């Protein structure tokens, strides 16, 4: 490891230790400092309330599962707008795996790609498991780590990511903001909420962004709006109508596809710039529209009993076309290219109805949820793939060619219906909490390209956990959980594939600030886990070209995470992740391989300080660092005879901000020292530079 990496690690370790010292010193600081005039800039920096992890009223500290909640205040601190950005300081999660992408977010959670949910219901995801939803309209982002099928049905074993939308508030308020930055970044956004009467409140959020990229010739526009209304016809009834619409138009983006020669490996003619665009600026284009309408209704029946229903109708359509690098020829500079076009139409209808009960039976306290959910997923995908597109020069790309888009051919036309019935009871006896949950799913998948051929799957999921609540806020827990995901395909004999299954054992400790002085807000989690995925497809040694489901993947790890805030002055985040992933059973060459984009080590720490009095009152600054160890870019396979190892990297972030009355000025910088690095390489022409330095200045008027 280079000396600079050791130095970066030492500095990160010092920062993490400093955060630990802050956490331990918090009680003394809270008692010693008498805060008179407080400039409240991030009152909800530290999460402590309910989450989608339990679909109940259970506090986060009492949920026997590792869950990270990134609050709106955390998102605002460093001006994050994508899921890849918000998980930079989160344990167990890696983001921005393929560098800057104007379309979607690339994440791994405990080694697997998570599925995106919005307000507790699955989003209209297509071939990629998220929609690229802009986070300006979100109140928080929740990462549920580990199998979550017991409450959400078919999900990956690594977990899910849920985005919670901003909701109407009874008090009038909002903001208008203008931003500008490098790469021609220009943005205007607004958020306004308030009462429309005694029992009605509304919210309207919107954004327009026009920006380029570190890749030459890229121009991306985004429009986002999100109206919402809440009705309270009675004290016992709340009806919230939620909606959003987002439109993206990205021109000229080659997605950063570059050959390994000149990026990860040496090229005798020199190094390829991270600004290189090997596509065709006038031809490459990505367009997407997606939106949703729905509601969240809750009615309290009395005596601890309530009923709640979430419903959402979502539509997504996208068109993508471009020229992309294929390989470097013998002269080390001529690059062959291919043309790829892709389109998707996705419609999702999802509804989740649950009855909640909180009450006592003798010495036992129950927090019970019984629910029925249904999801209808309609997907049509089409593509065109053509080799023999005009070559270009690696170091002086040719632009201005006229390219004719090939006609699209439908490759997938399917309808999937999933119905789930679930029951969970969190039983409290004195300071003990037992969490028991069970679910049964019925999944029907219809392939409309095969004369309506249907596949029906049935699956049980379970979760069991045990926690103990100490008076000082310390909560140790153990838990077991299962997950499943349907798989398309069949064996040589014609037997349909079974769903893949996930199984996890987890033990950990959580801590909140209930035992600390009022000025201290703190939440910490330490978790160890062993996660196994089974029924993984692997080559059938007896029948070439076919697969059988005898493969297995195992992921073991340790995650530590803390977020805190002291006397409205100091905010901090720190995390450490150790992940050991391996393909433990396979008939292919990937046996023993580590999972792609799953580093063994990830360390991060961030500290922000805001002055509360004196001549600098309202002024604040933050500084953070994040280290990711080397990762594998791919598994070995028929089209990937070599594993490309992505090098370890340390990046730094910073911000300065100033609050004066109702105005806020801020400057944020990610990758502060503009480190050029390769984020990922898989096959020989699939290398992606990581995100270079991004600087954004903003001025906001709050009201």
Residue ranges and their predicted role:
Residues 293-316, 338-448:
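Face-selective signature of the C-terminal outer-membrane beta-barrel domain
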Residues 209-213, 223-300, 315-346, 389-418, ...:
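Acidic/polar loop-and-plug regions of large Gram-negative outer-membrane beta-barrel proteins
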Residues 33-171, 507:
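Acidic, small-polar-rich N-terminal luminal/periplasmic segments of exported/outer-membrane proteins
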Residues 431, 523, 527-530, 549-636, ...:
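Gram-negative outer-membrane beta-barrel transporters
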Residues 136-139, 150-227, 233-237, 291, ...:
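Outer-membrane beta-barrel translocator/receptor signature
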Residues 296-302, 306-312, 316-322, 501-565, ...:
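Membrane-embedded beta-barrel scaffold of Gram-negative outer-membrane proteins
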Residues 572, 626-638, 657-703:
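C-terminal beta-signal and adjacent terminal beta-strands/loops
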Residues 230-234, 346, 365-369, 373-377, ...:
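Structural signature of Gram-negative outer-membrane beta-barrels, strongest in the C-terminal barrel
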């Amino acid at each position: 490891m280079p000396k600079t990496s050791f130095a970066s690690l030492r500095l990160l370790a010092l920062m993490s230790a400093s955060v630990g010292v802050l956490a331990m010193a918090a009680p003394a600081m809270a008692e010693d400092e008498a805060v008179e005039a407080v400039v409240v800039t991030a009152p909800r920096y530290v999460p402590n309330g309910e989450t989608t992890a339990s679909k109940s009223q259970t506090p986060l500290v009492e949920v026997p599962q590792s869950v990270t909640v990134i609050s709106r205040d955390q998102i605002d601190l460093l001006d994050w707008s994508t899921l890849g950005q918000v998980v930079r300081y989160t344990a167990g999660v890696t983001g921005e795996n393929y560098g800057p992408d104007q379309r979607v977010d690339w994440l791994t959670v405990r080694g697997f790609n998570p599925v995106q949910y919005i307000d507790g219901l699955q989003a209209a995801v297509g071939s990629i498991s998220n929609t690229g939803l802009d986070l300006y309209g979100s109140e928080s982002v929740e990462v549920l780590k580990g199998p979550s099928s017991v409450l959400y049905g078919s999900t990956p074993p690594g977990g899910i990511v849920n985005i919670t939308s901003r909701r109407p508030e009874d008090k009038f308020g909002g903001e208008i903001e203008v931003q500008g930055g490098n790469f021609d970044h220009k943005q205007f956004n607004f958020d306004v909420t308030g009462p429309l009467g005694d029992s009605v409140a509304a919210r309207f959020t919107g954004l327009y962004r026009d920006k380029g990229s570190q890749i030459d010739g890229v121009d991306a526009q985004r429009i986002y709006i999100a109206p919402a209304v809440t009705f309270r016809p009675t004290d016992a009834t709340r009806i919230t109508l939620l909606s959003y619409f987002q439109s993206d138009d990205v021109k000229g983006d080659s997605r950063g596809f570059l050959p390994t020669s000149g990026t990860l490996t040496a090229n005798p003619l020199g190094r390829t710039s991270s600004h290189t665009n090997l596509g065709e600026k006038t031809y490459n284009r990505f367009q997407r529209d997606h939106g949703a309408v729905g509601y969240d209704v809750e009615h309290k029946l009395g005596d601890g009993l309530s009923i709640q229903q979430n419903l959402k109708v979502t539509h997504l359509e996208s068109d993508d076309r471009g020229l992309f690098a294929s390989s470097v020829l013998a002269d080390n500079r001529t690059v062959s290219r291919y043309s790829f076009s892709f389109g998707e139409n996705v419609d999702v209808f999802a509804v989740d109805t649950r009855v909640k009960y909180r009450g006592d039976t003798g010495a036992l306290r129950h927090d019970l949820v019984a629910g029925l959910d249904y999801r209808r997923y309609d997907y049509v995908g089409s593509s065109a793939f053509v080799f023999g597109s005009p070559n270009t020069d690696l170091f002086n790309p040719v632009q201005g060619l006229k390219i004719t888009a090939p006609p699209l051919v439908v490759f997938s036309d399917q309808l999937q219906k999933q119905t789930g019935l679930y029951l969970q009871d969190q039983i409290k006896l004195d300071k003990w909490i037992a969490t028991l949950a069970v679910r049964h799913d019925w999944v029907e998948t219809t392939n409309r390209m095969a004369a309506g051929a249907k596949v029906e799957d049935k699956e049980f999921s379970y979760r069991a956990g045990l926690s103990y609540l100490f008076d000082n806020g310390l909560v140790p827990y153990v838990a077991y959980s299962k997950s499943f995901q349907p798989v398309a395909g069949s064996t040589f004999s014609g037997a349909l594939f079974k769903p893949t299954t996930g199984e996890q054992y987890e033990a950990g400790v959580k801590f909140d600030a209930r035992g600390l002085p009022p000025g201290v807000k703190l939440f910490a989690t330490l978790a160890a886990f062993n996660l196994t995925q089974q029924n993984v497809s692997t080559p059938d040694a007896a029948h070439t070209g076919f697969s059988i489901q005898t493969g297995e993947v195992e992921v073991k790890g340790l995650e530590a995470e803390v977020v805190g805030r002291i006397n409205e002055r100091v905010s901090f985040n720190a995390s450490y992740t150790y992940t050991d992933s391996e393909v433990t059973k396979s008939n292919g060459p990937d046996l023993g391989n580590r999972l792609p984009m799953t580093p063994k080590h990830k360390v991060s720490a961030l500290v922000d300080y805001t002055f509360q009095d004196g001549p600098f009152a309202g002024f604040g600054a933050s500084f953070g660092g994040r280290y990711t160890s080397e990762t594998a870019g791919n598994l070995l396979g028929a089209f990937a005879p070599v594993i490309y190892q992505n090098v370890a990297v340390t990046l730094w972030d910073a911000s300065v901000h100033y609050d004066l009355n109702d105005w806020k000025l801020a400057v944020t910088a990610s990758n502060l020292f503009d480190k050029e690095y390769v984020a990922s390489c898989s096959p020989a022409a699939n290398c992606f530079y990581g995100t270079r330095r991004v600087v954004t200045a903003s001025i906001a008027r709050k009201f």
